[in-house]
Swiss-Prot record:
Pfam families: Ribosomal_S5 (PF00333), Ribosomal_S5_C (PF03719). This is Small ribosomal subunit protein uS5. Residues 29-61 have a biased composition (Basic and acidic residues). With S4 and S12 plays an important role in translational accuracy. The lineage of its organism: Bacteria, Bacillati, Cyanobacteriota, Cyanophyceae, Synechococcales. Residues 9-28 have a biased composition (Low complexity). Residues 1-62 are annotated as: Disordered. Residues 59-122 form the S5 DRBM domain. Gene3D superfamilies: 3.30.160.20, 3.30.230.10. One of its GO terms (cellular component) is small ribosomal subunit.
Amino acid sequence: MTDSSPQSNPNAVPGAADVPAAAEGQQQEQRRGGGRGERGDRRGGRRGDRRNQERDSEWQERVVQIRRVSKTVKGGKKMSFRAIVVVGNEKGQVGVGVGKAGDVIGAVRKGVADGKKHLVKVPLTRHNSIPTLSNGRDGAASVLIRPAAPGTGVIAGGSIRTVLELAGIKNVLAKRLGSKTPLNNARAAMVALSLLRTHKETAKERGISLEQIYS
């Protein structure tokens, strides 16, 4: 009578039949884990993009002037565009930037980037005005700004008005003296805003109390 039971192989490795199944299980687990990691990375990327979009949406930009300029080089004249851009969040931060490029869009983009590099923080009162009178100068341009009562509005013109509005100032009086150049006027307004101090800061610098400032 023949024995129908399977013959044992002396050279067989114990558990060798389970190795492919175990390897396949590990691969499936890695694929599932990798998928979860990739989904997590994608979600994190979306959240980061959303935050950046919200941060960028707070800022407004206005083009004050676009001019075609030329530069004399060895081969002749090289034409390009220059854009003056004012950037602000209407919450007390504003900047003026200048960008040059071979096309208008590129010049505006560079102007926006330059404006965000030169931001000025403006102290605002509860009536969205400025705390004190201030005077700024740039080149031959001079700008005088003074606080105004609620309901007055922004009494200014040109690039000065753009700077004040994007800074978030709602009630102010401004006077331009000297040059009419938009860039000089905008920069003079920026100088005037950068010199502003709150009453608390002024009292601390002078070494007196707030009551003496208000009196």
